[in-house]
Amino acid sequence: DLPFMPQKEAWKNVSEVLDKLGVDVSDDVICYVMEHSIMSEEEKKAIARAEEEDTKIPTAKTQWTEDDDCYYFMTYTTWQDYPVLPPVMGEGFDENNVSVIYNKNGIQSLSRNGYYPLELKNEVEVVSPEMVLKALEKYFGNIISDDIYEVQRISLCQKVVQVNPDKHSAEIEPVWECRVLVKNSDLPDSSYLQKIYFHAETLKVM
């Protein structure tokens, strides 16, 4: 926690503002604690790195104080309590489309990307998590590898598809998101998180 306010209280204040704006977000929140002395050290490192690589040196802040302390929150939008996933995903793409910077004076920055007003078109019946596990087992069964796969979480989400930039519209499809921890058989201490998506009606890999 930062001196000006506990992290939980800061997020509570942010949530209240988002509610007033009609922005529904997940409770799965990432928070970076931006403490002024740490930011000062990181700035010095960035300048030293730029000098070493002979690249453009970033402009240094005159002085870092407690007034610069802030929380940087990241999360994603939901609709009818289900996460809405962006159309482009994977390595290099961030699923968190809502970000907020909050300091002792309140919200300093709030952004939401890739948002589409949503309306109910039709209801669908989704397959059970048990069927998803079977599909996941088959999926990894087709991979020739000695790696170890551990299912961390399976959650029902909605994925943006068929984006029409001209009409500023898109459709969403229900998907099961499977978070799997992959442990490298050759490097026991090396592991990474893999996300696999199945269409929640057809179990087709997306």
What is each residue range found by the language model?
Residues 75-82, 157-159, 179-183:
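Generic short beta-strand segments
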Residues 86-112, 186-206:
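A short, surface-exposed beta-strand/turn
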Residues 1-89:
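Preferential activation on post-signal-peptide N-terminal prodomains/segments
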Residues 23-24, 142-145, 187:
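Intrinsically disordered or highly flexible coil/loop and linker segments, enriched in small
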Residues 90-172:
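Charged, low-complexity helical/coil segments in non-catalytic cytosolic or luminal regions
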Residues 68-70, 93-95, 171-175, 191:
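A general secondary-structure signal for short beta-strands and their flanking turns/coil
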